[in-house]
Curated annotation (Swiss-Prot):
Belongs to the small GTPase superfamily. Ras family. The lineage of its organism: Eukaryota, Amoebozoa, Evosea, Eumycetozoa, Dictyostelia. The modification Cysteine methyl ester is found at residue 213. It catalyses: GTP + H2O = GDP + phosphate + H(+). This is Ras-like protein rasY. The gene is rasY.
Length: 216
């Protein structure tokens, strides 16, 4: 595939969540295939990676953001610049799980729409002895809030690549849905009601059950 084609498929993603949940670890594992044990707290880092997803080349522009409350104003700017979002909590931290809804509400408020492609992920799934949030709790919250869901491990790389791939797919499904809606405006049928409906597909990735969004 040509460079021009990949440049025409730039997808901007933002990874958000409470401090210390492993946002940077997940991102660097995806970008560089290695796990970082120690790093300085992130304010804002940007990464790029070319990926082949469903036989299509995409250039992913990934914004890794800070979780600190004092950076809320900056976070609004990050949200406006992105098309898809990955919300991270740690399965070893109940408080970070409780913050997921706050971050989702901020995204919805800033973008002023509720059909935003959002993937919710529970990181540190390898630390089962320290787990405070069950897989079912994560799945139930994601379903309630209309988000896709996976558990991942930045350390072992479990589901890390799948998270980014599925988020891109959700972004593209929304684009296709909006295009169909625009094309049907002058038609006889009214399909607009279906354009922002998410359907859930249960799949298995690396032996772990995941919940994936599909826009109709």
């Amino acid at each position: 595939m040509t460079t021009n084609k990949s440049n025409g498929n730039l997808v901007k993603l933002c990874i958000m969540g409470d401090g210390g949940v492993g946002k940077t670890s997940v991102t660097i594992q995806f970008i560089s295939n290695h796990f970082v044990h120690y790093y300085d707290p992130t304010i804002e880092d940007s990464y790029r990676k070319q990926c082949l997803i469903d036989d299509q080349v995409y250039m992913l522009d990934i914004l890794d953001t800070a979780g600190q409350d004092e950076l809320t104003a900056m976070r609004d700017q990050w949200i406006r610049s992105c098309e898809g979002f990955i919300l991270v909590y740690s399965v070893t931290s109940r408080s970070s799980f409780d913050q997921v809804q706050f971050f989702r509400e901020q995204i919805i408020r800033v973008l002023d729409r509720d059909d935003v492609p959002i993937m919710m992920i529970g990181n540190k799934s390898d630390l089962d002895d320290e787990r405070q949030v069950t897989f079912q709790e994560g799945k139930d919250l994601a379903r309630c809030l209309g988000m896709s869901f996976m558990e991942v491990s930045a350390k072992t790389r479990l589901n890390v690549e799948e998270v980014f791939n599925e988020t891109v797919r959700c972004v593209k499904r929304r684009e296709e849905s909006l295009l169909k809606k625009d094309n049907s405006k002058d038609g006889k049928g009214d399909h607009s009601k279906k354009s922002s409906i998410f359907k859930k597909l249960n799949q298995k990735v690396n032996g772990a059950k995941i919940s994936i969004c599909k826009m109709m």
